[in-house]
């Protein structure tokens, strides 16, 4: 930036993005000073190096905003877990189902686990039946990725959110945020 540019000649671009041609470093610094902006080296490895007349503080701010937005969009999908036993009451089942639906609507994957204890381990078909029932009940909000698999003393399935449901929810939340701003 500015005085740290060492090349004797540079390809100059004005603040609007238009090329001004190849000029000496001193001429480029003088033109940037006349406008009251900074001279920033955009591409140091090209022949001759490309420099641009711009407000460096604004450039750094916009770059940090772009990086922050990219990090926010990159946030991975987390896996939430819902556990229950083979002998679960209807009300408890409904509570677990509602919780799994809320996770799916938030865009998270859900790992549904059934834990076997004692003699329940000798009846895995009951676990498969319960997991199929759970997958059917939740099918409006998510799809079962994997069939039931045995994990030591339990069985589990992974349920992924259906894209259209999460997209609709995100759009509505953005619309609500837009309504609140003046």
Curated annotation (Swiss-Prot):
Provide the Gene Ontology terms for cellular component: cytosol; membrane
**A Pfam family name for this chain?**
IF3_C
Q: Mind listing the UniProt keywords for this protein, alphabetically?
A: Cytoplasm, Initiation factor, Protein biosynthesis
Question: InterPro entries, from UniProt?
Answer: T_IF-3_C_sf, T_IF-3_N_sf, Translation_initiation_fac3_CS, Translation_initiation_fac_3, Translation_initiation_fac_3_C, Translation_initiation_fac_3_N
Single GO molecular function: translation initiation factor activity
Q: Does the keyword Endoplasmic reticulum apply?
A: no
UniProt-annotated location(s)? Cytoplasm
| PANTHER family associated with the record | TRANSLATION INITIATION FACTOR IF-3, TRANSLATION INITIATION FACTOR IF-3, MITOCHONDRIAL
Oligomeric form and interacting partners? Monomer.
Chain's role: IF-3 binds to the 30S ribosomal subunit and shifts the equilibrium between 70S ribosomes and their 50S and 30S subunits in favor of the free subunits, thus enhancing the availability of 30S subunits on which protein synthesis initiation begins.
Which protein is depicted?
Translation initiation factor IF-3
Source organism per UniProt:
Tropheryma whipplei (strain Twist)
Q: What are the top taxonomic ranks of the organism?
A: Bacteria, Bacillati, Actinomycetota, Actinomycetes, Micrococcales
């Amino acid at each position: 930036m500015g005085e740290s540019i060492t090349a004797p000649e540079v390809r100059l671009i004005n603040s609007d993005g238009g090329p001004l041609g190849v000029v000496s470093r001193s001429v480029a610094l003088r033109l940037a000073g006349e406008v009251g902006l900074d001279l920033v080296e955009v591409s140091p490895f090209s022949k001759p190096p490309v420099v641009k007349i711009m407000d460096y503080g604004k450039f750094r701010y916009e770059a940090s905003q772009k990086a922050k937005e990219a990090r926010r969009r990159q946030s991975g999908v987390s896996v939430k877990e819902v556990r229950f036993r083979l002998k679960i009451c209807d009300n408890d089942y409904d509570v677990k189902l509602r919780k799994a639906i809320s996770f799916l609507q938030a865009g998270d994957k859900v790992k549904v686990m059934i834990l076997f204890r004692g003699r329940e381990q000798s009846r895995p078909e009951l676990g498969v039946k319960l997991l199929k029932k759970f997958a059917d009940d939740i099918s409006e909000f998510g799809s079962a990725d994997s069939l039931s698999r045995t994990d030591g003393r339990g069985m589990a399935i992974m349920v992924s959110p259906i894209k259209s449901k999460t997209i609709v929810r995100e759009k509505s939340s953005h619309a609500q945020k837009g309504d609140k701003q003046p």
